[in-house]
Amino acid sequence: MFSKINEEGNWRSLRHRNFRILYAAALLTNIGTWAQRIAQDWLVLELTHNNGTYLGIVTALQFLPVMLLSMQGGVLADKVNKKKALVITNLGSGISALALGLLTITKVVNIDHVYILAILLGIFSALDAPIRSAFIVEVVGKPDLTNAMSLNSANFHFGRLIGPTLSGFLIAAFGTGPSFLINAFSFFVIMFSFMALRDDELHEQKIEKTEGTLKEAFAYIKKRRDIQMIMLTIFFASNFGLNAQIFNALMATKVFHKGAASYGFLGTAIAVGTLTGALVSARKDRTKRPLFIPLAALNFGIWVMALAIAPTYLIYALVLPINGFSALTTMISANTYMQANSDNAIRGRIMGIYMFIFMGGTPIGSPLIGYASQQIGPRWTIAGCSFITLIAALVALFIYRNDGKVPEDISVAAVLRS
């Protein structure tokens, strides 16, 4: 059946057996991940009497390892067996989620437990992300890389569609514990899926010999103004604009005075938009159009502002899918551009630096957003995040307006000689 998939179609990456295995397992993992995110936020609000500052701190602690370890994860991605490394990172993530679930169900959990386990999960996630990103090209080959990235994003956001609603109903019926246990199980499933991959069906990449250092990766980026433009845009758009998780929790509880089920529905609403954005991206190849990314971020910033001024819960929920669509088209375009236009020999390190840019500001931004929401309210905080995103996109467009193309030769040697 899969051999008949159109080689030019939206689902062409599913022709690869290894990709099908990972894709199926990732669906369960993505549902579990989003279920845990909702449950963890709700647990923090329960333990701290709806204090947004604590919510920001927990988010920051989970992303702090990204700031400290994502670049090292990128170095590992260029040196180690990626499949074996991903088995280890998912085992660690599963144990972390299992521990939080058991502590919660036995009713001994406190905010310190959440802090510690958020850091542990963050450590494994920080190492996993650049290795997994660099591994995709080995699973499907470079011709199908962009399509595989888009389908993975669609998978992730389908999980975002199901996970929050599932978690909302589980919280209402049984409390937050079951969501953590589901996530633990999902990590163990994808761990075994990596073990089931056939090594002889992986696509070996021709890799030139390089230093293998972060210094070399930074020198490469210094010569690539197209990559600089994307990193500048994404740093501000992701670390300030992409805070719907915190925004939704605070708007649901403090502005619209809703319960767990309604909060979970907001996560589903934004997932409708992000899933649509991922499927649209699977049809379009923008890997040769770097200027599209700051333009997309500009559009995204406008829809973040629309969230800030939404007068009712219903209107807020209706704006979320559009916000999600604009966010996803921005982020997936940036991610696929970085992978498709980085040399094989340095891709892991470039993606490690990109992950740092993408999420590394969260440990700083999340507490600030949580604190600001306590001082000036969620609406003004969201408006401020929108303003920062808009300004960053405009600055990137102005500074790099003449850098809208990919170099003819992206090899490490050629770029460093230029």
Which residues does each predicted region cover?
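Substrate-agnostic recognition of the 12-TM MFS/MFS-like secondary transporter fold
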Residues: 20-40, 59-77, 81-96, 113-172, ...
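Helix-loop junctions on the cytosolic side of multi-pass membrane transporters
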Residues: 134, 138, 176, 180-209, ...
